[in-house]
Amino acid sequence: MKKVVIDGNNLTIEDVVKVARDKWEVVLSEVAKERIVHSREIVDRYVKEGKVVYGITTGFGKFSDVVISKEDTEALQKNLIMSHSCAVGDPLPEEVVRAIMLLRANALAKGFSGVRLETVETLIEMINKNVVPVIPEKGSLGASGDLAPLAHMVLVMIGRGEAFYAGERVSGEEAMRRAGIPTITLSSKEGLALINGTQVMSALGCLNVYDAKRIIAVADAVASITLEALRGIIDAFDDRVQMVRPHKGQIVSAKNVRKMVEGSELITRQGEIRVQDAYTLRCIPQVHGAVRDAISYIERVLGVEINSATDNPLIFPDDGEVISGGNFHGEPVALAMDFLSIALSEIANISERRIERLVNYQLNDLPPFLTEKGGLNSGMMIAQYTAASLVSENKVLSHPASVDSIPSSANQEDHVSMGTIAARKAREVLKNVTTVLAIELLTASQALEFRKGFKRGKGTDRIYRLVREKVNPLVEDRELYIDINACFDIIRSGRIEEVLKEEGIMLE
């Protein structure tokens, strides 16, 4: 079994994907175990001495001024989980929940949360035995962290709630019993430590940014096919043009396109057919590149967040102190996820306009809507409608969630991030972008049917042939949703990158 070792400091987004999607085993490092035990000693001492510490011997939120007796500290934590299990909506996908559990375990592994070692080990065992809590997708304000959804995760740990196990939705108690995992009784501070963090938005964020990195490379490849089908001008992709405005993403996108069309007889030079192309072709490096740079920034934000202690209060065992702070506030992730939605929407925006240039005979020398029997057949006409619909939907979804805030807990928690809403929206935007690119891939491949007799580029030809393995050329009208879905699957499966790699073309 392949393993990911967590220590609270070195988890990567790639590690998250390995655990979430590929079901790699999670192992807690020995150093992390020592830190967890050391941190727990401070909590036990404070409880024994009867010190007043938020979340350990007090209530929560506006009830932080209510002192809880030593005898009631365990009941306090159980009540916290029960009362906070208020999330609603459809269950989050399994891959997201597995990522959530991994990120929470990694945050606890830093040793600033004061939980018992057995509690962290229970969470890890649930990951390894694929006990997946049913976590409804809606209900988080993104500060204090993802309280409501994370409470549903903890319900299963204490033998309540619901979970998916072995393909069935069962009670949390049954899932734990069938997996052979003992349920736990929460001790002082543990309920709070398990739910007061940004792990839901961060889990969504990690999967979003991982997929976005793939999509931007695919967008370069798909745009290259359109460039070729429209006999675009390669001069705009010259490295010298990029180097006098040396944004890294722009340089990479131009390089990717040059790789794709190498050897093409369809690609033209400036002045050969046209002096210059429309912006949707000529500015591919500038637009795609800016999105690539945005994704790199977002990746850095998440890289910090997934290796952070995000609960409250924090235990500093070396100093013997417990400090209340605000690391649960999801603003860094909220802004990053809103940025991701905006950036990805631009990929769909420019892709849809390239689709229009492919189907609009007034903008090219191809048959209207890429069908030879126009009138009797509508060809690719309505595929562009679908792309336009998705682009417009993305414009709504890209309205930032982070600009909103509603005070809660009797105005004690008077500013929140809405980071999980931002992350959920970004996931939907990503699906729409992938579909728009699938429509462009389908449409550009159809356009190439009218460019017979010209040699295609090394990369574009390979992808064209990949499409034709799944989708026949459009001769007469048929149900295009089948073709769109086939191209969507080609993109999502990673086959584009695989076949290009076989040709020695490595997209960055």
From Swiss-Prot:
InterPro entries: Aromatic_Lyase (IPR001106), Fumarase/histidase_N (IPR024083), HutH (IPR005921), L-Aspartase-like (IPR008948), Phe/His_NH3-lyase_AS (IPR022313)
PROSITE patterns for the chain: PAL_HISTIDASE
GO biological process: L-histidine catabolic process to glutamate and formamide; L-histidine catabolic process to glutamate and formate
GO CC list: cytoplasm
Pathway: Amino-acid degradation; L-histidine degradation into L-glutamate; N-formimidoyl-L-glutamate from L-histidine: step 1/3
The name this protein goes by in its record: Histidine ammonia-lyase
Record carries keyword Cytoplasm: yes
Enzyme Commission identifier(s): 4.3.1.3
Subcellular location: Cytoplasm
Cross-link (5-imidazolinone (Ala-Gly)), chain numbering: 143-145
Class of the enzyme per the UniProt entry, highest EC level: lyase
PTM comment: Contains an active site 4-methylidene-imidazol-5-one (MIO), which is formed autocatalytically by cyclization and dehydration of residues Ala-Ser-Gly.
Gene from which this protein is expressed: hutH
Species the sequence originates in: Caldanaerobacter subterraneus subsp. tengcongensis (strain DSM 15242 / JCM 11007 / NBRC 100824 / MB4) (Thermoanaerobacter tengcongensis)
NCBIfam families: hutH, PRK09367.1
Single GO term (MF): histidine ammonia-lyase activity
CDD domains recorded: PAL-HAL
Family statement drawn from the similarity comment of this UniProt entry: Belongs to the PAL/histidase family.
Keyword set includes S-adenosyl-L-methionine: no
Gene3D superfamilies: Fumarase/aspartase (Central domain), Fumarase/aspartase (N-terminal domain)
Modified residues (2,3-didehydroalanine (Ser)): 144
Catalyzed chemical reaction(s): L-histidine = trans-urocanate + NH4(+)
Alphabetical UniProt keywords: Cytoplasm, Histidine metabolism, Lyase
